[in-house]
């Protein structure tokens, strides 16, 4: 099998996920007609099977499919397709299957954004050897399974809802998948995860990739669909006993990305501090400096109106801006991408006016 083919890419994604969702197809650039032919061929070759239970349909590898991948690239698949790993022997209960499928979507989005997810494309997480990292460039993604290789040290964070961590030049992002509703959330567990990552960053967990003892902010990214799920998250109160997500401040930054090609563009932007700086400079060029006397968070002033750059969709920052506007009984102004406008308008109502960045024009200028 050609390791550059779309068939191999799909099989690889199933292998590292355990069970794949059909929602990954757009990120693999599979059209409906091509996808139907591809699935038929892979099933007839005995490489995949469809697992259907509890009204959830997923794609799994057959024994033959696993053997093929192990023969083609043992260094890529041995950890996922051997022993009793969850990806090699996925369970049938609905919550676990949903988590595997959510992981498959997240991995597909990361790959679509050009971010490595396979072990041979990145240094070992706890190697401690800068030479191992010399040939790799950021950003890099590590799954939750990879950090759990520390064993007993990670017992207290085993219940974290995180799918993994994304290391960029200026920050470390903890990745979550929320879907169309608030995910289950245990504040103390996620705080322990943040403390765990902060400790190991300072101990040079990523030898050669980032400078030891540098203060890298640890932020969160939430993947959800549709875009309006962000409003649901920002308005969530955590439910009974605070067992579901709400803006609890466990992270200082909580970004929302839609599960879509628009989300891919936003992911690339978050991973590029240079591009964010360029965009900020363009957006702020005709506006006035921050006014500290206003007593609320803002990035610039338009006339007498506080303006917030909202394109990175930091839910915590947006929530604080809304609260401050309401408290001071003033109107604010938001600058966001066009695909984010409806959600922000619904969330802010009359408290803010909105100016949009044309996503298509942005992509043509910076990504083509």
Predicted segments — roles?
Residues 1-83:
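Basic, Lys/Arg-rich alpha-helical nucleic-acid-recognition elements, primarily the DNA-binding modules
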């Amino acid at each position: 099998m050609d390791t550059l083919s779309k068939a191999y890419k799909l099989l690889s994604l199933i292998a590292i996920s355990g069970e794949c969702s059909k929602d990954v197809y757009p990120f693999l650039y599979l059209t409906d007609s091509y996808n139907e032919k591809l699935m038929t061929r892979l099933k007839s070759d005995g490489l995949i099977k469809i697992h259907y239970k509890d009204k959830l349909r997923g794609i799994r590898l057959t024994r033959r499919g696993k053997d093929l991948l192990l023969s083609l690239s043992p260094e890529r698949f041995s950890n996922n397709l051997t022993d009793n790993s969850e990806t090699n022997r996925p369970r049938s209960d609905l919550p676990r299957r949903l988590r595997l499928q959510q992981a498959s979507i997240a991995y597909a989005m990361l790959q679509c954004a050009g971010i490595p997810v396979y072990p041979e494309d990145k240094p070992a997480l706890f190697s401690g050897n800068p030479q191992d990292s010399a040939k790799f460039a950021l950003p890099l993604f590590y799954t939750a399974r990879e950090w759990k290789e520390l064993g007993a040290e990670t017992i207290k964070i085993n219940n974290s809802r995180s799918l993994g961590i994304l290391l960029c030049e200026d920050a470390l992002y903890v990745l979550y998948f929320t879907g169309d509703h608030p995910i289950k959330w245990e504040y103390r567990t996620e705080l322990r995860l943040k403390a765990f990552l902060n400790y190991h960053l300072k101990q040079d967990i990523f030898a050669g990739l980032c400078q030891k003892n540098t203060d890298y902010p640890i932020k969160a990214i939430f993947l959800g669909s549709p875009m309006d799920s962000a409003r649901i998250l920002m308005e969530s109160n955590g439910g009974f006993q605070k067992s579901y997500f709400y803006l609890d401040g466990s992270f200082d930054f909580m970004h929302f990305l839609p599960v879509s090609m628009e989300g891919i563009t936003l992911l690339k932007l978050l991973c590029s501090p240079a591009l964010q700086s360029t965009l900020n400079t363009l957006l702020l060029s005709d506006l006035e400096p921050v006014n500290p006397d206003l007593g609320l968070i803002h990035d610039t002033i338009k006339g007498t109106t506080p303006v917030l750059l909202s394109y990175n969709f930091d839910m915590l920052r947006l929530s604080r801006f809304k609260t401050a506007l309401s408290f001071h009984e003033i109107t604010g102004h938001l600058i966001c991408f066009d695909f984010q406008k409806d959600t922000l308008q619904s969330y802010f109502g009359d408290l803010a006016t909105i100016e949009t960045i044309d996503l298509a024009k942005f992509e043509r200028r910076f990504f083509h």
